C-alpha cells in the first residue's frame, strides 16, 4: 500500500507562533486550551510547566496568563488587565483580524453577520468585539427570517470551508443594499483544504489527524469524506484500526493546523509497520 501525505497539512503559522510563545513563558498558565490538541497541551505542561486554567477569574494579580490562539472575549481580556494579570497574547493574528473588523464595522452602523460555530471559542471572542451585537449563522436558511439592516458586514470563522462561506455571501448580496464581505478564512486553512480535496480524490483510504474538538480538522475530514468514503478522523496512532487498511492500495494522510509533526510521524510509522 502506498502512503502519501497531503501537499499542505499540520501546524499553521498561528499555532507555531503560539507554541513558541508558550515555550518562552515557562511556569505560566494558558487561559483555555492554547490549541485544540490534548497531546501537545500535555507536552507543554510536562516540558515547560505551562498549565491550563479554564476560568479567567482564577488568575491573581501578578500571575502570567497566556491567551489561547482562538482569542478570548473582549470583556474578559479587559478584566485580566484590570486585575494586573501579566497577559501574554498568543491569539492568532488571523483571528484578531475578524475581531477588528467586527468592532470597526459595528461602530460604523453595519449589521454584523458571522459565519461560524457560536459555541466555538474563536467565535465567542470575535462576537464580543461587535459593539452593537452580531448574529452567528452556519447556513443560509438561518438568515431567512431575520430582520437585518440594509448595510451588512460579513466575516467568517478562520477555519471554515470557503464554499460554505460563499453560500452565505451569495444569499445576502442580492437581498440587501450593501454587503461587505471580508475574507477572514486563513491561508493555511484554505491550502490544507485544497490539498486534502486533491489527495482524497485518488486515495481509497484517508486518515485525518487532529483533536476531536478541532474545527479545522473537522472541516478537513468533511472534505475528505466527500471524496473518499473510507475516511477516518483520529487523534493519534492509538486510534488506528489496522483492519481499515485491508486490501487498500493508496492511503492519503492529512492533519489539522494544531497537530504537531511528532504525532503525524507516529501515525505514519504505525501504518507502515502494519503493512
Curated annotation (Swiss-Prot):
Name listed for the protein in its UniProt record: 4-hydroxy-3-methylbut-2-enyl diphosphate reductase
Residue positions of the active site: 122
Ligand binding ([4Fe-4S] cluster): 12, 92, 186
Cofactor (UniProt): [4Fe-4S] cluster
Cofactor note: Binds 1 [4Fe-4S] cluster per subunit.
One record GO biological process: isopentenyl diphosphate biosynthetic process, methylerythritol 4-phosphate pathway
Known function: Catalyzes the conversion of 1-hydroxy-2-methyl-2-(E)-butenyl 4-diphosphate (HMBPP) into a mixture of isopentenyl diphosphate (IPP) and dimethylallyl diphosphate (DMAPP). Acts in the terminal step of the DOXP/MEP pathway for isoprenoid precursor biosynthesis.
Organism the protein comes from: Sulfurimonas denitrificans (strain ATCC 33889 / DSM 1251) (Thiomicrospira denitrificans (strain ATCC 33889 / DSM 1251))
Pathway in which the depicted protein is active: Isoprenoid biosynthesis; dimethylallyl diphosphate biosynthesis; dimethylallyl diphosphate from (2E)-4-hydroxy-3-methylbutenyl diphosphate: step 1/1; Isoprenoid biosynthesis; isopentenyl diphosphate biosynthesis via DXP pathway; isopentenyl diphosphate from 1-deoxy-D-xylulose 5-phosphate: step 6/6
Family: Belongs to the IspH family.
Molecular functions (GO terms): 4 iron, 4 sulfur cluster binding; 4-hydroxy-3-methylbut-2-enyl diphosphate reductase activity; metal ion binding
Catalytic activity: isopentenyl diphosphate + 2 oxidized [2Fe-2S]-[ferredoxin] + H2O = (2E)-4-hydroxy-3-methylbut-2-enyl diphosphate + 2 reduced [2Fe-2S]-[ferredoxin] + 2 H(+); dimethylallyl diphosphate + 2 oxidized [2Fe-2S]-[ferredoxin] + H2O = (2E)-4-hydroxy-3-methylbut-2-enyl diphosphate + 2 reduced [2Fe-2S]-[ferredoxin] + 2 H(+)
Record-listed E.C. numbers: 1.17.7.4
Binding residues annotated for (2E)-4-hydroxy-3-methylbut-2-enyl diphosphate, in chain numbering: 36, 70, 120, 158, 214-216, 258
Binding site residues for dimethylallyl diphosphate: 36, 70, 120, 214-216, 258
Key word Iron-sulfur present: yes
Keywords annotated in UniProt: 4Fe-4S, Iron, Iron-sulfur, Isoprene biosynthesis, Metal-binding, Oxidoreductase
InterPro entries cross-referenced by the UniProt entry: LytB/IspH
Residues that, per the record, bind isopentenyl diphosphate: 36, 70, 120, 214-216, 258
Amino acid at each position: 500500500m502506498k502512503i502519501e501525505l497531503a501537499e499542505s497539512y499540520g501546524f499553521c503559522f498561528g499555532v507555531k507562533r503560539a507554541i513558541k510563545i508558550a515555550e518562552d513563558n515557562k511556569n505560566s498558565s494558558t487561559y483555555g486550551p492554547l490549541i485544540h490538541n490534548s497531546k501537545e497541551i500535555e507536552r507543554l505542561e510536562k516540558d515547560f510547566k505551562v498549565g491550563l486554567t479554564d476560568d479567567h477569574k482564577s488568575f491573581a494579580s501578578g500571575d502570567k496568563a497566556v491567551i489561547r490562539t482562538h482569542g478570548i472575549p473582549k470583556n474578559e481580556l479587559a478584566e485580566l488587565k484590570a486585575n494586573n494579570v501579566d497577559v501574554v497574547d498568543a491569539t492568532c493574528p488571523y483571528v484578531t483580524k475578524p475581531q477588528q473588523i467586527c468592532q470597526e464595522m459595528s461602530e460604523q452602523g453595519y449589521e454584523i453577520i458571522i459565519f461560524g460555530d457560536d459555541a466555538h471559542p474563536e467565535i465567542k471572542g470575535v462576537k464580543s468585539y461587535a459593539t452593537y451585537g452580531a448574529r452567528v449563522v452556519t447556513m443560509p436558511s438561518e438568515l431567512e427570517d431575520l430582520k437585518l439592516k440594509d448595510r451588512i458586514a460579513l466575516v467568517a470563522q478562520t477555519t471554515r470551508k470557503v464554499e460554505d462561506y460563499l453560500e452565505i455571501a451569495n444569499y445576502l448580496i442580492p437581498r440587501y443594499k450593501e454587503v461587505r464581505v471580508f475574507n477572514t478564512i486563513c491561508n493555511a486553512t484554505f491550502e490544507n483544504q485544497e490539498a486534502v480535496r486533491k489527495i482524497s480524490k485518488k486515495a481509497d483510504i484517508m486518515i485525518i489527524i487532529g483533536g476531536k474538538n478541532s474545527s479545522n480538522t473537522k472541516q478537513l475530514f468533511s472534505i475528505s469524506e466527500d471524496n473518499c468514503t473510507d475516511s477516518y478522523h483520529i487523534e493519534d496512532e492509538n486510534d488506528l484500526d489496522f483492519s481499515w487498511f485491508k486490501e487498500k492500495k493508496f492511503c492519503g494522510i492529512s492533519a489539522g493546523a494544531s497537530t504537531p509533526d511528532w504525532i503525524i510521524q507516529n501515525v505514519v510509522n504505525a501504518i507502515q509497520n502494519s503493512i
